[in-house]
């Protein structure tokens, strides 16, 4: 393929029996008049986009069976987006050639069930002869045949139309949308259109009201529908599809039926215009660009939802919380994510989130979910927001909408430290502790689950728990992440050591518990800027001496760590426990590390930290548990 060739959006290949007029057809198109003597075959022709009705660069390949060997023909066919099989209406044997030679050769090139459209072109239709009777059954019997046209290179009849149809067959292909055997929409087209319907049904009542239909129309075609047009659409639907319209609104069945009508009437471009607006490419998959916008995240920066992102996901919650109880029941939750390819919040990972007594996701838990994935798995946030329709309606001129606007990249952590402040909202806290130290109980408390809940969860496990925590008057998200270090010898990955704060848990009733924390601390966090804190668990039990060089309090003093905090029984199951506030606080104000250590409110009042100090005073009081 030459460089020019690769530029072509549409590649049309002409094949057919000898002498049926392939070269003449291309000549007539190029010269805009009949040319008597044509060469055996023409070189590749490249037609620039601006002279084609659909504005696509088109290449036309004229093949002559005499000159080309079959391998060459097959290789040209394979590169084609659409194939015109030319026959002569004055020569029946060329009609037979379609079924005996050309269609089989195309299948042999692409495979039995290929999707490359074929157009049957009956040339030399300048006399009285036609072959419609023989052609229609061929079209019926071979679903890859998109359409058939009779034309004449001599009189110019339908010459430009053929090439226009060929282009349209590529840009607005039928086969992904329509199953000619069953005369129904294909499964993937149904699925795509169901997604479109759900996104457009903005109040989630199952109907497209006139307003919703009009917005949809404006979105896809740029102009509103007149009220007569609206009525016409609804009448056409209810005539052919009894359950298509109810309450004077379009139902899902009606919406699908409407698209079936478009397709059956040859107006595929209408359905394609809709699908493309919602991110689909020709394969009816969402395009890579739509799903995964390009973004670079500099080292030390993190990703969070932008105000638009927050607004979008929060509106989704409103839309799907049908009974307005502030929680998503399993069916509401399933409904919300039904346009996504895989269920995202499962029985297991819902344990990372706050739920109500019945185990239903709260608004808080739902928002926390988005904050979590945006921090730890941005690709997944992009993908889900794309499926959920975030980009829809956000496309600028010449640019398909994408999900980039849903995200903001935070300032580098180093700069935050230098400036003693951050506008980040989501912070990550590692939870480190020996086996049985009480990590799960501690973490689940942030989601509001207590001992009994944890006992029920059993071995099911989420390595994350996230919730909203108040720091000063602001709310921040604290993401707890359990590190799976079975022994202090295990290596921590860079993802793990890059946390904003580390909580080391040790069981006061187990003499070997603290050694684990001390070892991991010294190995990974000593001399780093990451704030760390020791947390004593199972404090209602009798305290035993820890088998370590020094007791925990002494250890903390040596390393200038804050005194160990007691995670008392009263804190279990409490998402608003002051311990979580303290962790969030340490994550938000890491430069106050030494202040946390000094733990002296008199001294504190003498140092000026700007706004941070106000909150800190409050926190230090809370700290003496
Ligand atoms: N009456 C009539 N004759 C045509 C028409 N188109 C082509 N012909 C004649 O048919 C003959 C074959 O035309 P070509 O364009 O060379 O056919 P081709 O399909 O390119 O032939 P090969 O390259 O040999 O396979 C020539 O004598 C043309 O003048 C047409 O529309 N009407
Ligand atoms: N009495 C008391 N028991 C606790 C406390 N915290 C945890 N436990 C119990 O200690 C045991 C271990 O707690 P988990 O939270 O599962 O500990 P873990 O660190 O997650 O354990 P692994 O994941 O197996 O390493 C469980 O039986 C808990 O019920 C506490 O504060 N007081
Ligand atoms: Ca030729
Ligand atoms: Ca509605």
Swiss-Prot record:
CDD domains: Miro1 (cd01893), Miro2 (cd01892)
Cytoplasmic side: 1-601
Localization terms from the record: Mitochondrion outer membrane
Pfam families to which the protein is assigned, alphabetical: EF-hand_5, EF_assoc_1, EF_assoc_2, Ras
Chief localization: mitochondrion
Segments crossing the lipid bilayer: 602-622
Entry binding sites for GTP 2: 433-440, 470-474, 537-540
Enzyme Commission code(s) on record: 3.6.5.-
SUPFAM superfamilies attached to this UniProt entry: EF-hand, P-loop containing nucleoside triphosphate hydrolases
Enzyme class: hydrolase
Cellular component annotations (GO), alphabetically ordered: mitochondrial outer membrane
Mitochondrial intermembrane side: 623-625
InterPro entries xref list: EF-hand-dom_pair, EF_Hand_1_Ca_BS, EF_hand_assoc_1, EF_hand_assoc_2, EF_hand_dom, Miro, Miro-EF-hand_domain, MIRO_dom
GO molecular function: calcium ion binding; GTP binding; GTPase activity
Membrane topology designation: Single-pass type IV membrane protein
Residues that coordinate or bind Ca(2+) 2: 321, 323, 325, 327, 332
Purpose of the protein: Mitochondrial GTPase involved in mitochondrial trafficking. Probably involved in control of anterograde transport of mitochondria and their subcellular distribution. Plays a role in maintaining mitochondrial morphology.
Designated name of the protein: Mitochondrial Rho GTPase 1
